[in-house]
């Protein structure tokens, strides 16, 4: 077993690229239409993306403080553990591993193949093998070098931003102001009302998730006291500007009633640009593949650090804590999580059911934001960066997360509750086993 610790090798730009690259994923290709349908007017659609991004800032402030107080790998698991609840910390990691981390790899890999299928016909079985090959390729990349993986992540993040910049540039040139003056749609509630704006903001929520992924790797980040706050808040502002400009130009490119009813808003909007026309679909398919490739790469890179942290505490399979003696990466954790992701590729029906675990993951985030209150009561709590206006920021972080929990519960109440029961029913016995084993190992040492 490799016994050495992971080293701090990641600088600010690599960390920023991971945060932005994880956040800007396939969701934005459909969320503009969903937000437009919920908000009901072009201006409220744009405003929803602005406010949706601003709401995330308090959450990133909480993560920034916690990550500088506990600059180690593991994110939510570490924060809940230090807040005084090892069982909750374990359950958060348990749920993440089985219901979020590995399945997300399969979902993204299959999404890349789906977009590839837009360009050329692909046999379904062959497509699954291509998806598996993508996961294996990124496993090898991130297993061999954290610096090499970070360099690739920086390049792919730049590559995924370029097409959006092109869309924004073309959109400004072909922008039609009359689309903002056209009659509004009959969206949720009274059009233009406060409730419609809230609905629009809620619809942006998933587009802004992913920035806190870098907290999984805090133990490998140089100067975390400065790097983490800058990367977390900076990535939020960058994504906010990108999404707001996209929403603005797309709302100005096509009639709003068509936008609000579009399942592929970016692709449909680009067909209104004469320079692209029928090639818009190809452009979007290629862009989507680049975007999802970046997200898949970042997930293969950061997610295994959670199980690594749990294994180091003797609360997970010991092999997950192995560090490669030459490459200084959590090699076994990367391999096994990737292997589970490949398994899910070939069990697609099971993967679709795992979406119902979203309620559990949202509630886990709420608990993490609340953990800062208990952490601040500890005598040994000494963060290198503190959240400004702590009471207000923490309240906003918890409240915005609870709203997401509520909306997720409304989407699938019974399946969500069943999944919560599954996590507890399987997680608590597993925790009892590893906690007992951990005590025995500590007694022997």
From Swiss-Prot:
GO molecular function: L-amino acid transmembrane transporter activity
Membrane-protein topology: Multi-pass membrane protein
Gene Ontology, cellular component aspect: plasma membrane
Transmembrane segments: 10-30, 38-58, 93-113, 121-141, 155-175, 181-201, 236-256, 273-293, 334-354, 355-375, 389-410, 417-435
Protein name: Probable fructoselysine/psicoselysine transporter FrlA
Gene designation per UniProt: frlA
PANTHER family named in the record: AMINO ACID TRANSPORTER (PTHR11785), SOBREMESA, ISOFORM B (PTHR11785:SF512)
Alphabetic keyword roster: Amino-acid transport, Cell inner membrane, Cell membrane, Membrane, Transmembrane, Transmembrane helix, Transport
Transcription regulation as UniProt keyword: no
Biological function: Is likely involved in the transport of fructoselysine and psicoselysine to the cytoplasm, where they are degraded.
Catalytic activity field: N(6)-(D-fructosyl)-L-lysine(in) = N(6)-(D-fructosyl)-L-lysine(out); N(6)-(D-psicosyl)-L-lysine(in) = N(6)-(D-psicosyl)-L-lysine(out)
Localization: Cell inner membrane
GO biological process: amino acid transmembrane transport; fructoselysine catabolic process
One Pfam family of this chain: AA_permease_2
